[in-house]
Amino acid sequence: NNGYQVDVSALKKKDSKLGKLGGYLSFYIKSIFLCLFHHYDYLYAHYISHCALLIKIIKKLKPSIKVIVNVHGNDVVPEDAHDEKFIPLVKSTLPLIDLCIVPSSYYQKVMMEQYGLNEDKIKIFPSGGINFDVFQEIENAKEKLHLDPNKKCIGYIGRYEKRKGWEVFLEAISLLENVEQYQIVMVGVGEDEEKANALIQEYHLENVIKKYPMQTQKELALFYSAIDIFCFPTYRKSDSLGLVGLEAMACGCIVIASNMAGPTSYIKDQENGFFFKPRDGKDLNQKIEDDKTMYYNETESLIWRIFNCVYFSARQEEKYVKNFEIKYKKQLSKQAKKDIAINKMNASSFNWEK
């Protein structure tokens, strides 16, 4: 641990109410015991709504300990009445912290505007980022997945859950003018999967959409590489970053995302991706259809946008940018090369913390 001593107290997931109660008791007792009988400089608490009371107890016992919290979901942006119950406790705990880690500039704004946290107490760290040794464009991905290499592929990767926007995606697909010209893939599982299957039947898309269960990271990279247009239709306010959008960008997808929440932290509309109105399947459909007439000829347009996606999602990691330039150099016109050079200058000044 690079010279640091780290002890971990973790709350294990339980399904039953009794199991959850026992899990919390065990978690609290272990955490308090560790802090009482060891000298720690820092207490790092992940998901503040579950740890707020514990932080208060430990700060009472050990006033000198510095507290770092990581907020990243409905712990600070409630989605329902159950989440709302924890917000007063969270608000009363925040004055005790020394540093708040957030995954995006969107969540930085939430913590400043809704919780009154000072900017100097907030640090942006994008959820560990992306493993670019895994998430990169894979050649012949469509063939490897037994998809038609001559058809554009439109995809959704994510869970079938409330507010994830899978039904918005299906509405957009149902409105495609010539849906048979495309191939549609959906990857994921979730409690609303049967509802998704019913909606697919209602829209008569059974022979159009190919569904796959959730995949490993390496397998996901293959799907992203096969997808030309990746749709990220979330309308969850608590989607703090949305790693799927960044993973898709790293693999060369054109990303069309809801203009809200986490994706607004890294997508620049019409530069490295596109926005549509949240919960608006018609607008998403129009963005998909409009893609046919965008910037340069079709091949060069795709290369241009792959560059944007790789450059921004790699956060200027040179080896990935150079690999892209070597791979596509011969296929780019002089004008495209000039525009990419200008875009590199613009990207290099892109402030990830604002």
Please report, for each region that a protein language model flagged, where it lies by residue.
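Nucleotide-activated donor-binding/catalytic signature segment of Leloir-type glycosyltransferases, i.e.
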Residues: 197-215
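Short alpha-helical donor nucleotide-sugar binding micro-motif in glycosyltransferases
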Residues: 214-215, 222-227
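A short, histidine- and acid-enriched strand-loop-helix "catalytic/donor-clamping" loop
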Residues: 15, 65-84, 96-99
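Donor nucleotide-sugar binding/catalytic pocket of nucleotide-sugar-dependent glycosyltransferases
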Residues: 66-69, 91-137, 211-212
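Conserved donor-binding/catalytic core segment of Leloir-type glycosyltransferases
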Residues: 148-164, 170-173, 185
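A short helix/loop element that forms part of the nucleotide-sugar donor recognition site in Leloir-type
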Residues: 134-148
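Conserved acidic donor-binding segment of nucleotide-sugar-dependent glycosyltransferases
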Residues: 269-270, 274-281, 289-296
